[in-house]
């Protein structure tokens, strides 16, 4: 009997232990399968692209709503991760990860400010590569004057302390930064991603303007960027469809030594003049298309090609605006014999042109207007010399 009682007690203890273990197992939270829930780079499918009409120097593609891939040129690759989304595992070292919202940008590429301005996104920029007095874009100047945007040094000498204190999440540089690669390395070492703007390498003026879409992607305003670009194309469409006027246009400025700086035939200014219906007075035969497509020639060479030009446009963005033909002739009396000078068809482009990247369309409209009417008024960037 005693032996039987011991056996029954042992059986009851085993049963109790089993029940307790099952209960504890029921209370234990399930461990998620990390391999199934985590987002991986290889698992992303970029199956939707931002439509581009003319730009060739960048592309934007999407994997769902949370991941945007941006490529620039042949050597820049970015993954833009939506706010509150997971950073994928296994992102290649060649891909720079950015996190939305980008709200502490260091903007050194001054030509890009106009894109941010049109997207109502100047407030995303905390640091500037220009001082307040150097800005012609009012929203940028105002932001610096009120202190929401601060000067952080030019491309070759950034203020690293200010950049780190601001919590900078992206530095946007122009291609001049390639002359000081150590700056890129230092920024990246301190945790600041670097994007080098290449709109100047677009072969088409309309491709330059289309970079609005890239900045729209960076700040999450692609729809606004696309609609504004479509409006601009619609405004230019009647002009682009017209036949050339046959009139010749020279675009130039005179440097301090008396030589003349002109655009090569493949430059975007030369192409903008052609889009407006003019024939650009060319000084080369290469048709080279790159960001440095300017050349300096002697005044005698310029005179030989431009003496019969129907219209002259003086590029005052470099050495200051001129207002009269007499001021132009002070720089070079030889120009007095030029057809455009004698007929009073000499114009000056205003200094704010190069900061207003989207205004390239307005320049096309301006040139078209003076080709149609030598007395055209109320233009965006061109002013007739008196």
Protein language model features and the residues they cover:
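Bacterial Sec-exported substrate-binding components of ABC uptake systems
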Residues: 19-113, 224-251, 375-386
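Soluble non-cytosolic domains of exported or imported proteins
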Residues: 99, 153-158, 174-181, 202-209, ...
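Extracytoplasmic ligand-binding site segments that recognize negatively charged/polar headgroups
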Residues: 103, 110-113, 128-139, 179-182, ...
């Amino acid at each position: 009997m005693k032996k039987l009682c011991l056996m029954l007690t042992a059986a009851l203890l085993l049963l109790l232990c089993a029940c307790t273990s099952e209960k504890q197992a029921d209370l234990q939270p399930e461990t998620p399968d990390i391999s199934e829930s985590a987002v991986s780079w290889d698992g992303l499918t970029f199956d939707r692209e931002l439509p581009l009409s003319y730009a060739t120097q960048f592309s934007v593609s999407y994997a769902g709503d949370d991941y945007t891939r941006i490529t620039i040129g042949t050597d820049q690759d970015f993954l833009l991760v939506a706010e509150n989304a997971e950073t994928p595992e296994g992102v290649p070292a060649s891909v720079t990860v950015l996190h939305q919202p980008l709200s502490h940008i260091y903007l050194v590429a001054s030509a890009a400010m106009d894109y941010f301005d049109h997207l109502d996104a100047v407030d995303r920029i905390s640091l500037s590569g220009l001082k307040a007095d150097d800005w012609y874009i009012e929203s940028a100047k105002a932001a610096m004057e009120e202190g929401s945007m601060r000067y952080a040094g030019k491309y070759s000498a950034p203020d690293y302390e200010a950049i780190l204190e601001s919590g900078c999440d992206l530095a946007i540089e122009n291609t001049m930064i390639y002359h000081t690669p150590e700056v890129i390395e230092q920024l990246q070492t301190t945790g600041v991603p670097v994007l080098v703007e290449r709109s100047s390498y677009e072969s088409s003026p309309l491709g330059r303007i289309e970079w609005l879409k890239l900045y729209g992607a960076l700040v999450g305003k692609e729809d606004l960027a696309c609609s504004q670009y479509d409006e601009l194309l619609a405004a230019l469409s009647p002009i682009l469809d017209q036949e050339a006027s046959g009139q010749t246009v020279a675009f130039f400025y005179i440097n301090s030594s008396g030589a003349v700086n002109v655009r090569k035939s493949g430059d975007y200014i030369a192409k903008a003049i052609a889009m407006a219906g003019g024939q650009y007075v060319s000084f080369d035969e290469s048709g080279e298309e790159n960001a440095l497509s300017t050349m300096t020639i002697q005044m005698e060479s310029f005179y030989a090609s431009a003496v019969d030009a129907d219209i002259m446009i003086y590029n005052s963005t470099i050495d200051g605006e001129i207002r009269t033909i007499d001021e132009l002739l002070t720089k070079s009396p030889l120009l007095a014999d030029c057809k455009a000078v004698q007929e009073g068809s000499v114009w000056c482009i205003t200094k704010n042109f190069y900061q207003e990247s989207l205004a390239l369309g307005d320049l096309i409209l301006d040139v078209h207007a003076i080709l149609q009417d030598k007395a055209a008024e109320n233009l965006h960037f061109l002013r007739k010399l008196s």
